[in-house]
Amino acid sequence: MPELPEVETTLKGVSPYLKGFIIEKIVVRNPKLRWEVSKELSTFKHVKILNLTRRAKYLIIHTEQGYIIGHLGMSGSVRIVPHDNPVNKHDHFDIVMNNGKLLRYNDARRFGAWLWTNNLSEFHLFFKLGPEPLSETFNSTYLFKKSRQKSTALKTFLMDNSVVVGVGNIYANEILFLCGLHPQKIAKTLTKKQTEQLVFTIKQVLNEAIEQGGTTLKDFLQPDGRPGYFAQKLLVYGNKDKPCPRCGTKIKSIIIGQRNSFFCPQCQKK
C-alpha cells in the first residue's frame, strides 16, 4: 500500500504538470472505487488548478471549483502522460489538462478514491486525523501524552491515524527496529526517552524515504514510471529468517492487527 512517502513523492512528481494549468475535463471510466467517484468531478470544464497539497495519504488538488481529493488505496498509482497515451486496463480516471498532459489513475484493486469537497475543514474523512509526522505539532510531548491512554501494541499505536498520520506498516517495522522496541510492547509503557527516540526516528525514516522516492515492493511507481528506492534500505520488513543487520539473529515475523510484523528478537526484546 502506498504510504506517506509515496504520496509525498507523487505530489512532488505531478505538481509541475498541474499547478497553474487548466483542467479541460475529467474522464471517469469506472466510478466504482472504494467510494464512488464524486459526480461533481464530471462537471469540471476549464477549471484552473491553484495548488496541490497532502493530508495524511490523501492528495489534495486545490481548484477554482473546490478541492479534488485522491487516495491511492492498496495498489493505485498516478502517471503524467500525453493526451494521446493509450488507455490500459484499470485506467479508471483522467484529469485532462490544457498543456497536452493528463493525470491518469490506474488501480487494479479499485480500493482508491477520487472525491470532491468545497470545504476542506468540513471534509468528513479528515475529522479524526492526527497530526502530520513531519510537523512541529508531532513531538515527544504530544506522543508521550497520547500513549498514556493506550493499552494497545506499540506498532498498532503508531499506525493509528488518530494518533499520527502516515506511519504505515512498512515504515512502522523499520522505525521500531531502529529504536530497539518490540512491536508488541504496550504503548502506555513507553518512557519519555523512548518517546523522544521514536519521534526523532519517525521523522528521520520518513524524510529519508521521501528523498529516495518512496518504497517499491509491488505496485508503487513514481509518477514518471521510476521505482522508489527506499526498498533497497529496508532492514527488517519482508526479511523473515534473514540475519539481523545488527546482531545476526534471524528476523522473526508475527501478525499484529492483521498485518505482518518483522522484528529481531535479540535487538527488540519484549
Swiss-Prot record:
Cofactor: how and how many bound: Binds 1 zinc ion per subunit.
Keywords from the named record: DNA damage, DNA repair, DNA-binding, Glycosidase, Hydrolase, Lyase, Metal-binding, Multifunctional enzyme, Zinc, Zinc-finger
Annotated CDD domains: EcFpg-like_N
Pfam families: Fapy_DNA_glyco, H2TH, zf-FPG_IleRS
An MF annotation (GO) of this entry: 8-oxo-7,8-dihydroguanine DNA N-glycosylase activity
Catalytic activity: Hydrolysis of DNA containing ring-opened 7-methylguanine residues, releasing 2,6-diamino-4-hydroxy-5-(N-methyl)formamidopyrimidine; 2'-deoxyribonucleotide-(2'-deoxyribose 5'-phosphate)-2'-deoxyribonucleotide-DNA = a 3'-end 2'-deoxyribonucleotide-(2,3-dehydro-2,3-deoxyribose 5'-phosphate)-DNA + a 5'-end 5'-phospho-2'-deoxyribonucleoside-DNA + H(+)
Sequence intervals crossing the membrane: none
Entry annotation: catalytic residues: 2 (schiff-base intermediate with dna), 3 (proton donor), 57 (proton donor), 259 (proton donor)
Residue spans, zinc finger FPG-type: 235-269
EC numbers, comma separated: 3.2.2.23, 4.2.99.18
Domain of life: Bacteria
Gene Ontology process terms (BP): base-excision repair
Family annotation (InterPro entries): DNA_glyclase/AP_lyase_DNA-bd, DNA_glyclase_Znf_dom_DNA_BS, Formamido-pyr_DNA_Glyclase, FPG_cat, MutM-like_N-ter, Ribosomal_uS13-like_H2TH, Znf_DNA_glyclase/AP_lyase, Znf_FPG/IleRS
Residues bound to DNA: 90, 109, 150
Quaternary organization: Monomer.
NCBIfam families: fpg, PRK01103.1
Family: Belongs to the FPG family.
Function: Involved in base excision repair of DNA damaged by oxidation or by mutagenic agents. Acts as a DNA glycosylase that recognizes and removes damaged bases. Has a preference for oxidized purines, such as 7,8-dihydro-8-oxoguanine (8-oxoG). Has AP (apurinic/apyrimidinic) lyase activity and introduces nicks in the DNA strand. Cleaves the DNA backbone by beta-delta elimination to generate a single-strand break at the site of the removed base with both 3'- and 5'-phosphates.
This protein's name: Formamidopyrimidine-DNA glycosylase
Gene source species: Histophilus somni (strain 2336) (Haemophilus somnus)
